[in-house]
Amino acid sequence: MASILGVETLQHTNGTTAATIDSTGRILTPARPAFHARYSSSGTEGVQGDIVFNEEDFDIGSNYDTSNGRFTASVAGIYYFCFEGLSAGSSGGGVLADGASTEVCFHKNGSQGAWSSRTYIYTQGASNYITASVVDIIQLAASDYIQVNVNSNYIYSDASGNYDPTFQGFLIG
């Protein structure tokens, strides 16, 4: 004897929709927050402190704010974040001097926690630009925010758009 279970909507225990099944049998889930932002400048420069990535390539859920550089979680969960850019030695975008360093990290709710991944770049033997990259998987409650912070030296950007630092992230689950 065959049994048929007719389901159109799956709900979380708090009553929010987890998934729906359309008339063709496809399972549809609510959009998951995801974004990709970049820092774009009109000239050659170095940026420091909390970085405000002023252009968005996409922002599913409208969680990234180009006015303050923060991704604010609208949904509690586990998130993946990534930053990439070139380190610079001055606010004018100059190369890192021999023996100089740059530190880049994620700040959660305005501070760097013990959990936070960071990259610490140190030049030795030559003045140059060096790629900086930070990746982390972070648990956020709804309304927690993440931003990128450069603690020492600078991150490089120029008007060509070829060297725009980027910040991206998405909800894993």
Locate predicted features.
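Extracellular jelly-roll beta-sandwich "head" domains, especially the C-terminal globular C1q domain
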Residues: 5, 13-16, 27-173
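Acidic surface patches and DE-rich sequence motifs
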Residues: 12, 22
